[in-house]
């Protein structure tokens, strides 16, 4: 229950009357009624209401036009969901009168049915101390000849960023500043979060299209949009705008003021830019995270027609496992928080329409529809398990109770006599032994052969191996070696190579 309602329950509470002359004056019921007359009946009804309530005109002409343009009636979610589920034939029939919306079971819901967007790229952890607190004021035009202009101050902050870049702006169309942000995100791997006003998103996307960005350059950039607080009335809602403007870098520096990231603001208009450091940054840190939590996603990949990241397409069941913290211990590549839910939403949109059970579950609430969708996925959606790479070993075959690798099947024994200098060996004369002599008795048991009498090389065969090698001593400066690798008897000693 709201604090004002709790105060009304107190017997000793007396509502204090706040007049227009007091500084605490904020809300007036008579002005709200005049605003409803403006939105419902136009300028003439607004003037009549002011005369009836004996009020002075509290809205200027541009404000009246902007309020009428931002006003929109409420939309009933239940008839809209039913209309999407109907066929084209039923859509031609006259729609029935809208039913009254049912009351919610919870007057003050303590849990949202939407996912809170996470800061998946990371956030700076500055602790309790953020450095020395300083305040510096910059103006345009500069007061001092050597003072930097406002755009230079902003670009230097972005180019020196190492941890995180956070931007809150109502209108962002300066390509030079955004190019510095893209370079910081792509080259230095600095996480970038940008929050824009909903009305200024289309102009921001126009600037991005002119820069001809690629998918790998914006992977460390998250763009979201928010609206103003708004004004709610029984007949509709007036949508507000975002007027905050500040740039936070590394959690210890903030630039805020009237300066916006546009060419006109840095060359034509008069602006102020306040540079804050130290503990002065903490309120801006909190404000940015609160704005990010209520913001809506702006998909740059879809808006700019980019391919996006190439990843594996998991089913909904596997996706729920991968975002579980206990599976993160054994998963080699964990998706950022919230990525799987966005993937499920994209898959549903690509499928073309709502599931068959959505219309039936709409009457039971959002939770019933989610449960029904999950149970349906277990039966209908093919489960795709994450790929498992095999162990990089050679193919093994079973032979005589032992494992034999395929890499050793085609080995041939070296000839006992080295080829002659002219290359006319036994193989050239057609007198070479068949190749299967070695492979057929690779691991056969055989008695030891006596050592070669010449002492040049010895062939040793153990009980477990018959592999024979021709070994010798490396020739030195005083010894001579021929092309076969043999050395003189005076400098070579018998060497045995035993494989056990």
Swiss-Prot record:
It comes from the Eukaryota. Residues 82-109, 347-366, 391-500 are annotated as: Disordered. Residues 2-300 are annotated as: DUF1669. Keywords: Acetylation, Cell membrane, Membrane, Phosphoprotein. InterPro entries: FAM83 (IPR050944), SACK1 (IPR012461). The modification N-acetylalanine is found at residue 2. GO terms for molecular function: protein kinase binding. Changing residue 284 to A: Decreased interaction with CSNK1A1. GO terms for biological process: signal transduction. It is found in: Cell membrane. Its main location: membrane. Residues 477-500 have a biased composition (Polar residues). The modification Phosphoserine is found at residues 4, 479. Residues 425-442, 458-468 have a biased composition (Low complexity). Residues 397-419 have a biased composition (Basic and acidic residues). PANTHER family: PROTEIN FAM83A-RELATED. Belongs to the FAM83 family. Directly interacts (via DUF1669) with CSNK1A1 and CSNK1A1L. All members of the FAM83 family of proteins share a conserved N-terminal DUF1669 (domain of unknown function 1669) domain of about 300 amino acids. This domain mediates the interaction with casein kinase 1 (CK1) isoforms. Therefore, it has been proposed to rename DUF1669 the polypeptide anchor of CK1 domain. This is Protein FAM83F. It comes from Homo sapiens. The lineage of its organism: Eukaryota, Metazoa, Chordata, Craniata, Vertebrata. The gene is FAM83F.
